Amino acid sequence: MVVEERKQTIVFGDLTCDSVAGLRTLVTVKDNPLLISFFERVTTGLREEIGLLPFSQRQRFIRFTTFEELLARVQRSTCPHPALEKALACTYQLACFIRQYTSPGHKYPSTQQTCLVGLCTGLLSAAAVGCCQSITDLLPLATHTVLIAFRAGLFVADVRDRLEPQTGAPLAWSVLIPGLDGDTASLTLQKYNEEKGLPATSAPYISTYANTGVTLSGLPSALNDLLDSSCLPKNRALTIPIYAPYHASHLYGQKDIESILRKASATEFASYQCQFSILSSITGQSIQVDTFGALIDYALNAILREPLRLDRIVSSLGEALLSDSPIRGCTIFPIATVIGQSLAAALRKHGAPDITVDPCMNSSIAVRDDRTSTTGHLGHSKLAIIGYSGRFPDANNNEELWQLLHEGRDVASITPSNRWDVKTHVDPTLKKKNTMGTPYGCWLKEPGLFDAKFFALSPREAPQVDPAQRLALMTAYEAMEFAGLVPDSTPSSQSDRIGVFYGTTSNDWGETNSSQNVDTYYIPGSCRAFIPGRQNFFYKFSGPSYSVDTACSSGLAALHLACNSLLKGDIDTAICGGTNVLTNPDITAGLDRGHFLSRTGNCKTFDDDADGYCRGEGVCTMVIKRLEDAKADNDPIIAVILGAYTNHSAEAESITRPHIGAQKAIFEKVLTSAGVDPYSVGYVEMHGTGTQAGDAREMKSVLSVFAPETERPRTDAERLFLGSAKANVGHGESVSGPIALIKSLMMLERNEIPPHCGIKTKINSGFPTDLMDRNVHIAKQPIPWERPEGGVRRIMINNFSAAGGNSSVLIEDAPVFEPKSKEAEPRSTHVVAVSAKSSTALIANIKSLLSYMNATKPELPSLSYTTTARRTHHPFRVMVSGPDLPEIHALLENKLASPTVQNRARAAQRAAFAFTGQGSQYIGMGESLLNFSTFRSDIERFNGIAETLGFPSFLPLLESGNGDISELPPLVVQVGTVCTQIAMARLWRSWGIEPCAVVGHSLGEYAALNIAGVLSEADTIFLAGKRAQLLQEDISANTHAMLAIGTSVEETRSLCDGLEYDIACINTPKETVLSGTNKQIDRILDILSSTSLKKTRLRVPFAFHSSQMEPVLEKFKAAARGVKFYEPKVPVISPLFGEVLTSKEPFGPEYLARHCRETVNFATALESAKADGVISSALWVEIGAHPIVSGLLRNNLDSTLKTVPTLQRNKDTWKVLTSSLSTLYESGVDIRWSEYHRDFIPGLSVLRLPSYNWDLKEYWMQYVNDWSLYKGDAQFLKGTPGLSTTCVHKLVEEKKDGNKITVVGEVDVLRDDVDPFVRGHRVNNLPLVTPSVYAEMALVIGEYLRKQQTKLSGTLVDLQHMDVQRPFATKSKGKGPQLLQCHVVLDCETFQGSVEFWSVTPEGKKLVRHALASITFPDAKAAQEEVQQRAQGIMKEMDDMAARLNTDDRVQKFTGKTGYNLVSSLASYDPEYMGVSSVLLDSGRLEAVATVKFNNPRTDGVYHVNPYLIDNLGQPALFVMNANDQADLSKEVFVNHGWKSLHFYKPLSIQKTYRSHVRMSGPDADGLYGGDMVVFEDKEVVAVYKGIKAQGVPRRLMDYIVHMRDDTKAGAPAGGTLNASQSAAANPAADPSAQADSDNWQAALKIISEESGVPIAELSPEAAFDDLGVDSLLALLCASRFREELGLHYESSIFLDHPTIKELEAFWKQGAPETGAVTVSGRDAVLNSMFTEAEAEVDQDKNSSDEDRSSLGTSSYEVISPNTTETTPEITKTSSPKISATSLLLQGNPALPSTVKTLFLLPDGSGSCSSYAGLPRIHPSIAVVGVNCPFMKTPESYTCGIDEVTQMYITEIRRRQPHGPYALGGWSVGGIFSYHIAQQLAAQGEQVSELILIDCPVPKGLDHLPRRYYEYCDTIGLLGDVNGVKRDPPPWLISHFEACVNSLHTYHATPFRPNNAPRTQIIWACDAIDKHCEPKFDRRPDDPEGLKFLTSTRTDFGPCGWETLLPEEDMTLDRMTGANHFSMMKGEFAKRLSEMIEGFLMIGN
C-alpha cells in the first residue's frame, strides 16, 4: 500500500508586498537570537554597501545605524530607493522563513517534500533557502543574498533614471490588465509602439503572464499615454506598486548580470549545492542548476530579462500533483505575497486535489503575542584611534611631548606670574588666609595663544573664553587633520553622527579670571559644558556633547563614555579628550591644605620620598571610530581600543583613597571583556601620582593582575614595563588620562618605552622586592620595544580620581595591512592642495609642507590624497600639479613667491558647462577616463542602451588610441561623442561641480539638454543616433562642406555677395562658419584667397545647419514624437533661439529639427545669458574631447574668462584634468575630492602632514590684586578709598597690578556743583563738557597719584596730548545721574600714565570714550626755572607789542566782549566763561597778549585748578586765529583742537588777574596751526600751555551746523518721539557731491571696525568679512551707517559681492553710488568734532537702558571718531526701560528734500529686517526703513501677544516719523504686523495711506507649523542660503519662527473701518517651495492649512480672504510667476518685487 504524502510549496513573493510593515513587526521579536543576528548582519552589510558607493549614488540613500532606524526612515520616505526596496523585500522573505524555522517544533523543511517558488525577487530568497539545510547555514548566505538584491535594485534604479528621470513622487512602472491574454496584449503593444514611433527603450512591454490577465510595464509616461489611448480598457487597469523596470530583455543583457554578480564577489558561497526543487518563473519547471552561484545568475536573468510566467508555474505544479507520485495533497506557504489563495484556486481548477493555504509565515501571524522585553545583542566592535593632538606642559605639540618623554625630563617649575603671584600666594606656614605651601606646577608654555579669526570669535569674546575651551578647539582641529577626518565625507563621518566628549574638572577661568569683569560672553566662555558644546557648534556636529567631571579620571571617563556611544551605535565618530588650565589659586590652595600636593616639585612616582603630586596642565583631543568604519574609510589607525571601563572604590576607607580591590576588579573586567590574557600586556601606564599610599596600592593592584607572585613569572618575551607620564609633566588631573593615553600611542608608534624619571632617590620601599623575578621593570633609559612578528603589543592605561572613581583603557597595535599595490595607480600627474583661513597661515602651511617633503620624501599619490580628500579646505588656497615630488616642490616655492598667494578665493564659485560640437573627436578620446568607475559604468550603460536601440557599439571610439576617426561611421562617432560628453559631465558632477547653466555647440546641445534634465539619457542617445542614422541613410556624405572664417556675418555677406551658402554658425562677432556644397565652398575659398582672413575647411562628412539637412527633417521630427521633454533643472543657453530657456515649452520635435537645420547663433546666446545674469562671474568647464568652445567663450564674454577643458588632443589626460581641477579649486570651487580618489584608494594612505599653522594672538584676562586672598574680609568688602573734589566726586576703582596702578575717578555732570561748568558752554545750544573739565579731572587724579608715590616728591603734574574725540553732551536735569569717568593707568617704572575719559551707565558700564590724554611728572623746580629763563624775553615781546599799538596797523586792541562776539558763531558762553577782559593782537605775527579777569567768580568748590580758569586762560589762542586781519569768518572759522602739554607751577586763584602771551604759526601738513601760551601773575610764570592746536573749519559747514540747531533736543521727554525737524537734524540733507573715494574709505573702514569689534589695525587687505563675523545683520548695520553717515547708498550685499577688505576697497574707490546724507572729509578730525557737536545730544536715559551693543563693536552713544566722520549709528531704540524694537535705514534717506515717502517694512517670522536687504532700490524718492523684532535673538522671551509687540513697533516707527501719512508693509507674517499696526495708528487718528502685503496669509489664527517644515527649509537652503551658498542658520532663527507663530496663533483680525482703510497691494508667490528641489517636502493629509499656504502651488490669486478685512475696490493684486514664498525675496524676483512696489507707491506721486 502506497502512503500518500503531502507536498509543501513555499512561495516567496515579489515587490508588491509591503515588506517594511512586516519587518517592523518582526523587529519587535527579542527572543530569537538568530533572527536578531540576521537583522544585524543585514544592517552592517547595507551600511557597508552604501558607504562604498560613489557620492552621487550614496547621497540618494537615507542614513541609518540600526535596522529599526532604517525601517522607520524608509516607511516615512515618499520615494524609497529601489535598491533598498529590493533588499528589504528579500530581507522580509528570509526573515519570515528564519522566524518560522527557529520556532519550537519546526525543523528545516524536507528536501523531498518541499518545492520552492520565487516570484521575481522571491527567486533570490528561494535560491538562498534552497542551498542550505539549517538556519545556521542560511544566515551568512541569506545576508549575502540580501546584498545581491540590493545591487540588483541599484542597477535597476540606474537604468530607470537613464530612461525617465524622477521628477517628484515615484510613479508606477507596471499595470495589471485583468482578462487580457498574452497574445492579444503582444499584438496591441506592437501596433501601438509602431504608431507612436516609440524608441525601444520607451516602448511598453509585457512583464507578467498569468491565467487571469497580463501585467504591462514601461515608462510611467508611456503607460499613461497607452492607457489614455483606445487600445486598452483603461477602466480595468490596476496600478501595481513597482517603481522601476523589471523583466525587460531589451533593457538588460547578460553583461549586466555579470556586472551585478562581479560586485557581489563572495566566492565562498558560489559553490553551495542546491538541495531543493526550485521552480523556474520562466518555464515553470524545476531549475536544472546545481550551485548557488548558478542559481543566482538564473534568478537575476528571470528578474531582469525574462517575463514572469505565473501561468507556467500553475501548470507545472498542477502536473506534479496529478502525476503518479504518492504525493496527493499540497499545502501552500506564501511568504510576502497575496498570491497563495489565487494559486490554490488555479491548481484546483487544474484538477489538483486537497490544496490548502497556510499563512503561518506571514510576520503578523508568526510573531503572535510572544514578544518579550529581552533586548537584542549589541555588537562588540573594536575601536580605532585615528588621530590625536594636544598641548602639554613645556610641549606645544605631540613631537615636543615625545621629545621630553624620550629625554626623561621633569618639567615642573615655579608658577608663572600670569597664573598668580607666588610672592603673595605661597606661604609655607599656611598662616595667611587662602595661601598655598607649594610654588610648583607643570605649565603650558603659552595658554593664551589662540586663532580667534579661524574660529569666528570676536576680539571682545575671545579673552572671555576659557583657554581650555580655546585650546580644545585647536587640538580638535589638529586631531581631525591627523585622522584625515572631513565631516560628511563618508557614512561614518556624518556630522549628526559625531559626538564630543571632554573631561574637565574645574571652572578656573570663570571663577577667577573672567569673573573679574562679567560680560556678555561670561557664561558660554567660562562654563565647562561649553568646552564640548563649542566644538559641536563650531564644527556643526549634531551628536551628543558631554562634559565629564569625575575629578582626576575625567578624561578617561569621557573616553569610556565615547567608547560606549560608539559600541551602542549612538554615534559613528567620537571626538574626546580632557582639559586642565590652572588659573584659580584657590584650588591649588585647597589641594595643598588637603595634603594632596608635593611641596618639593614634581610627582616623584615610585620614589621612596614621594610626598604628593604636582599639578599639571594640558589639553588633549583624540578621534575614535569603530575599527570596521576606520578600515572602510582608509583611516590612519594608530592603535585599537580593546576595552574601557569605569568603576568606583566604594569600599575604600576614605573617599580620596584608592582601593586595591576596586582597581584589581577594573583590570580584570577590561581584560575579560576583551578576551585578553594579562600576560600579553607588555606595559602598564600607571596613574602614579607620587604619594606613598597611592603608589603602593596601585602597584599592588597592578601586580596582582599582571604579574601575580603565586603564578609563573613572565618570560623574557612577556616582560612587563611600568611607568607614568606624571613624573614628567605632572598630574594633569582631568587631562591626565588622555595625556597617558597619548604617551602610550606614541610608544607604539615609535617602538620605544621612554625612561621613567620619577625615582629621584630610591624605589618606593612599599613595593615588592621581587619585581625583577616577576620580570617587571621600570625603564631608566629609552628601551626599544618592537612589534613582535605576527603579534601585537598591548598597553593598559590606569587612571583613578580623588573622588573614588577608577577608569582603565586597554589598547593594542593597529592591524597590519597587506602592502598596497602601486601598480593600481594609473595617474601620471597629481594635485597637491594647501589652504588656510588667512594669507599668513597659508604661507606658513606651504612652508611647513615644503619642509615635510624635504624631510620625508612622501609618496606623491598619497600626498595628493591627504591634502585634498582628507583635509577641510579654506578660502585662502593654492594647488599645484605635477608628475613627481621635485616638480611639486618647485611649484609650491613659486606659489610662495607669487603675490597671488595673498588672494582669497571667492566663496562657492559656480561653474557652467559648455559642450563641444563637431570636429573635436579622435580615436581613444576617453580611454584614460575609463579608470574612473563612474565614467566607465556610464559608458558601458550608454553603450548597452545604444545597442538596445539598434545602434552599433561606440566603444571603439574610446578604447583604442590607434586608427583614423574618418574610418568610423558618423553614427558611431556622433552617438559616441554625445555619450562620452554625458559621461564626462556626470563625472564632473560626481566631483561636486554642478552646472549653473549649460550650452551646447551644435551636436553638443544633445548632451547639454540631458545634463539640464530636459532629455533622459535613453532618449538623448536615441535622438543623437536617429539623427546620425538618417544622415547616413538619406544623405550622401562628403558632398557638402563647412568653412570657418575669421570675420563677422556682415563682412562675410559683403565678401560673398551673390554666392549661395548657408550661415551654419555664428561663433563670435568675428568668427563665422559657412555650409554649402563642395562647389559652393570651393568658390568662396577662391574669393577669400585674396584676403588675409583666417579660413579653415572643417573635416566633417556633412554640412550641418544647412540645406543638406532638409531631406531628413520630417523623418527626424516623426522619430522624436515618442520622446518626452522635461522642465530644465538648470538654465539652457540656446544657440538656436539666441536666449536662455528655463521652461520645457520651447523644446520638442520642432526644436530638434530646427536645431539640425538652422544657424548655431552661439554669440547671441552667450550675450543673452550674460545680460540675464545667468553666467555672471561663472567659471566654465568645457565638456568634450578637445577645448574648442573655450576660445569662443573668451572671445564672446571676456578675454580673462576662466575656462577649463576635460580632455585635450595629444596631451596627457591626467595633466589636463589636474590643471583644470587646480584652476577650479583656486577659484573657490568646492571639489568632492573623496570621489576623485575613490577608485584609487587601495594604493593610497593618509600621511601625517604638519599641523595647521595658526594665526596666534594672546588673549588673556589677568587675575589681579590677589583678591582670592581677601574674599570675605571686611576690608575686601569696602569701597575704594575716598577722594572727593568738585570735578572728581569719588574714586570708583584703585588697584595695583604688578608695576601698574589704575585709578578711576567719577563725576556726575548733572550734580549742582558741576552742572554750571557744562551748561555754561554751548555749541548750537547743546551743553557740552569742555576740555577744561577733562583737564581738571586728570590733574586731580594725577596729583592724588603724585602724593602717593614718594619718588614723585618735588614734581608737578603735566597733562599732555589732550585729544577730545567725541563731545559729551549733557541731558536735562532731573533725569538721574549722568556719569563721566577718568581712567588713569600709571606705570610705576617710567612714571608715565595714560588717561581716558568715558561716559558710563549708573552701573559703571562703559559707553563712549570721549577723550584721550597722558600725564607725566617733571621736576617742578627745573621746569619752572627753565620757563622763567624764557619769561624775560616773552615779557619784552609783550611790551614791544604794546609799544607798536600806535605805529603798526597790524596791531590792534579790543575788549574781551568784542572777542567773544567774533567767535559767537562757534559757541556761546555764560559770563563765568567770558573772563578775557582785553586783547592786544598782532595779526601779522599771529601773536596776542590777553588780560584775564573773572566775572562773578564762584568761590565754593574744591579744585586743583578751577575749570573756568583753565578754559579762560586758553581762549586767547582762538582770538588770535579768528580776529586777525586775514581771518574771513564768512569763509572759515578756527576751533581749538587740544594741546601737547599743560601744567601749573602754583595754585591759581579765580579772584586774581592774569596776563597771557600766545604766538601761533602754521599751517602744518595737516592744516593745523600751533603755538605756546605762557601765563603770568605779575612777572611770575604760573602756567604753560604748550602745543596749542587750532584748525580752520569752512564757514559753509558751520552754517550748516547752525541750521541743524534744535533747542528742544536736550530737553526731549523720556518718551522720546522726535518731531519732523528733529528727524531732519539727525539725518542731514544730501550733499549731491558725496561719493565713494579714498577719503571716506577710511570712514567706512572705521564703521566696519566698530560694528565688528575688530581693531582697524587688524583689518588687513586679505581679511574676510565672514571671518570678522560680519553676518547679514552686521552687513545691514554697516550699510545703514554708510547711507546715513557717508551719504553712500550701498546695499548690504556688497559684503557678499566683495568678501574681503581688499576687494571692497577696490570696489569702493571705483566710483560713486547713489548719495544720501552729507559727509565730512574723513581725514579732518577737527571738522569731524565740529560736525558731531551739532548732533551730539543723546538722551542718556535712553541709552543707559539700551541693550549693550558693544558686541557689535560700537555703543549707541558713539558719534564720531578722531579720524573719520561718524554720526550716531542708525540702530536706534525707544527710550523705554523695557525691551524695544530697533530699525535700520535700508534705502534712501527720509531727511532728503527729494524723499516723498518712507516705507516701513515689518519683520517676517525670522524677526529680522535682513529679509528685505535683497530688494533693489525701489525709487530715488522713496526711503525704506526695516524694523527688527525686539525678541529677534532672544525668542525665549517672546511670550507676549500681537498687541504688545506691535506697540513696540509703533513706538519705533513714530520715533522715526511722528505723524502720518504712513506707508507700511511686510512679507509673510510681517504683513500681519503691518495690518495690525495700520489699524492701531488709524485708531490714534493717524492716516495710513498705503499697505503692502507680500505673500501674507489672512490673520485668522495662524497654524502651528511642524518642526519638519523648518528642518526641510533648512535642508534645501531656504534658511541659510547666501548667494547660493548653504550656511547654517543662526541658532535663534527657528525658535523665533515658532515664538512668532505662537504669538499670532490666537490673533483673529477684525475688519478695517472702510472710511479710513489704506490703499492695499497684495503680492502673491505662485510656486510651491519644493518645485525645483529634491527631495520633495513630506506632505501629509493632516497638515494644517497654514502649512499648505507655504508649501503648495498657488491657484487662487485674488484677495484670498483679505476682502473680509479691507475694501476690495482699493486693492491692487499682483503675482510673482516662477517664484515661491522664499525665492520672491531674492535675485531677479526681488528686482521684480521692487518694481511692483514702486508702481504701487508712485501712484499720484
UniProtKB/Swiss-Prot annotation:
Xref: Gene3D superfamilies: 3.30.70.3290, 3.40.47.10, ACP-like (1.10.1200.10), alpha/beta hydrolase (3.40.50.1820), Malonyl-Coenzyme A Acyl Carrier Protein, domain 2 (3.40.366.10), Polyketide synthase dehydratase (3.10.129.110)
Domain called PKS/mFAS DH: residue spans: 1289-1599
Domain Ketosynthase family 3 (KS3): 380-813
Domain of life: Eukaryota
Region annotation (C-terminal hotdog fold) ranges: 1442-1599
Annotated cofactor note: Binds 1 phosphopantetheine covalently.
Active site: 552 (for beta-ketoacyl synthase activity), 687 (for beta-ketoacyl synthase activity), 731 (for beta-ketoacyl synthase activity), 1321 (proton acceptor), 1511 (proton donor)
Sites bearing O-(pantetheine 4'-phosphoryl)serine, chain numbering: 1672
Transmembrane segments annotated in the record for this chain: none
Region (Malonyl-CoA:ACP transacylase (MAT) domain): 913-1213
Top EC class for this record: transferase
UniProt region (Product template (PT) domain), positions on chain: 1640-1709
UniProt xrefs under SMART domains: PKS_AT, PKS_KS, PKS_PP
Pfam families: Acyl_transf_1, ketoacyl-synt, Ketoacyl-synt_C, PP-binding, PS-DH, SAT, Thioesterase
Matching CDD domains: PKS
Domain Carrier: 1635-1712
Name of protein: Non-reducing polyketide synthase pks27
Species lineage: Eukaryota, Fungi, Dikarya, Ascomycota, Pezizomycotina
Underlying gene: pks27
